[in-house]
Amino acid sequence: MTASRKSSKTPKAAAARTSRRKAPRASRAAAPAAKVRLTAEVSSGGCACKLGPADLREVLSKLPVVRNPNVLVGNETADDAGVYRLSATQALVTTVDFFPPMVDDPYVFGQIAAANALSDVYAMGGKPLVALGIVAFPTGKLPLAVLLRILEGAGERVKAAGAVIIGGHSLTDPELKYGLAVTGTVHPSRVVRNGGARVGDLLVLTKPLGTGIVCTGIKKRVAKAEEEAFATASMITLNDVAGGLLTRFDAHACTDVTGFSLAGHATEMAEASGRVRFEIDSSQLPLLPGTARLADDGYVTGGARRNRDWLGARLAIARDVTPALREAVVDPQTSGGLLVSLAPKKAEAFEKALHARGLRPAIIGRVTARPRTSAVVVAVS
């Protein structure tokens, strides 16, 4: 399958096919520690809480670019993690992510927070080694058993990644937040950056979209049980398999799709790659069950609005793209998939390899040359 070939498969049909499969469980150990609704204790949750990309860039643009011969990846291209060379054969990959809960179960929240933090290391082609926990907890407002379950859930995912949590820091806060600072390793010559996409490449997305929309439905108590189950299963899934195959299939560029949305992170990739444009085939976008229904009913995030405003004219969407898909491309993702740019034959082999390992990737577009006045990311129907 190539991105240039039209398909009759609609996102709703893809979601329907997905929903016919039995929704995987987060964990048999995921019983809540107490009868609390974590989403009712916070104003918003997950990566939808990220500082808006426009505000973040305004501040970061005033800081000096890091100049150090051992810093292989710094703050100049909005990459997923920093990379510091230790020797000719080893470099450190380091990153941090934390946020308020987007689900009600403390154990599952811990799992999602850990998977989300680990993802940045995988997106760079690295392997996680150690993590430090970051806790902001409303002492006296929530029972300590909730915190214990969060830490247990995070520990389960970190252990599954072959890494260990070796410490952390905690403070009291009116709103619950949790996350990890993660350090991993990568060979200096095998770092995969977000810049490097080439004209003619195909774009592979390794997870379905819609976590921000579905989690809004969870918070508002309008998401169906099956919709919540699929979103949860997607968010706790590690990006280790896809990340581990990046160098095998000679990925030219990669990023993980999180709070700045598919369109936002695609724009960062395209701009870091030079005069290229990403053309997204909206008919190929995989959506989590319930995404279209909830989006059509207005359950979208403030983060989506901030993403859309920041992108402005750099994002062009064809008129016949459905309203739900228009929302999905700017929807903030929590623990989303990897967006990978590869040569066509490599992309098809990469997609096939992920399918063989039980994942549901999709080739969603292609990389073209960008005229000087053109949008950076284009979504077509």
What are these model-predicted stretches?
Residues 2-381:
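Helix-biased detector of long, well-ordered alpha-helical tracts
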